[in-house]
Amino acid sequence: MRKSAAPKRPVVKDPVYDSELVTQLVNKILLDGKKSTAERIVYGALEICREKTGLEPVGTLEKALGNVRPDLEVRSRRVGGATYQVPVEVRPARATTLALRWLVTFTRQRRENTMVERLANEIMDAANGLGASVKRREDTHKMAEANRAFAHYRW
């Protein structure tokens, strides 16, 4: 094991919206090192959000992530011979990472024609409290609530 925790590397703000969240989203969309393609997808999706909602796209993205960020999750903990699903609070950085991961995962599973449309619609759905990524958060919270009896095994 390493002696101390690895230092968090600073996230560079993206040039268009001056937002760390947009940079993180671009990096999550990224496949095979094609960053310009990932940027085109994200910026296109945010533009569609601006046209359809008439609001600032970064605000819409933040609202969407706020609706997708989990507060609790379950982690496996072995006690004796049994493995318990122990509910734990999610640290803010991990909550954001999970929210972005779920957003991108469920964007890829959508049925619209282009990735730009899929991402835009998933962001707008999440901002309105709909969509598969919000459902994933609710399921995660339900799991934590169901296993509340094991909360005293927290570490």
UniProtKB/Swiss-Prot annotation:
The gene is rpsG. InterPro entries: Ribosomal_uS7, Ribosomal_uS7_bac/org-type, Ribosomal_uS7_CS, Ribosomal_uS7_dom, Ribosomal_uS7_dom_sf. GO terms for cellular component: small ribosomal subunit. Keywords: Ribonucleoprotein, Ribosomal protein, RNA-binding, rRNA-binding, tRNA-binding. PANTHER family: RIBOSOMAL PROTEIN S7 (PTHR11205). HAMAP family: Ribosomal_uS7_B. One of the primary rRNA binding proteins, it binds directly to 16S rRNA where it nucleates assembly of the head domain of the 30S subunit. Is located at the subunit interface close to the decoding center, probably blocks exit of the E-site tRNA. It comes from Corynebacterium efficiens (strain DSM 44549 / YS-314 / AJ 12310 / JCM 11189 / NBRC 100395). Belongs to the universal ribosomal protein uS7 family. This is Small ribosomal subunit protein uS7. The keyword Ribosomal protein applies. Coiled coil: none annotated.
